[in-house]
UniProtKB/Swiss-Prot annotation:
Belongs to the bacterial ribosomal protein bS20 family. This is Small ribosomal subunit protein bS20. Keywords: Ribonucleoprotein, Ribosomal protein, RNA-binding, rRNA-binding. The gene is rpsT. Binds directly to 16S ribosomal RNA. The keyword 4Fe-4S does not apply. One of its GO terms (cellular component) is small ribosomal subunit. InterPro entries: Ribosomal_bS20, Ribosomal_bS20_sf. Disulfide bonds: none annotated.
């Protein structure tokens, strides 16, 4: 348990940041899931639209430090590859 005033404040700040990060991570997962569902349904137009919405969300999460930049880039790349394969 935190004893000093500064440690107590740090604990409160961590709790707030954790809540924000959890919400951002959940939002990213939702967008990625929408892309994967569109890919699974075979709808190329819907998959492309979902990817277009998911990409900035993933990169924003990377900018904010919620996910690593390389992780976000890898996810975008792999999703784009799968969407492109639908049109082939």
């Amino acid at each position: 348990m935190a004893n000093t005033t500064s440690a107590k404040k740090a604990t409160r700040k961590i709790a707030r940041r954790t809540a924000v990060n959890k919400a951002r991570r959940s939002r990213v997962r939702t967008f990625v899931r929408q892309v994967e569902e569109a890919i699974a349904s075979g709808d190329q137009a819907a998959a492309a639209a979902a990817l277009k919405a998911a990409q900035p969300e993933l990169m924003r999460a990377a900018t904010k430090g919620v996910v690593h930049a390389n992780t976000a880039s890898r996810k975008v790349s792999r999703l784009a590859q799968r969407v492109k394969a639908l049109s082939a």
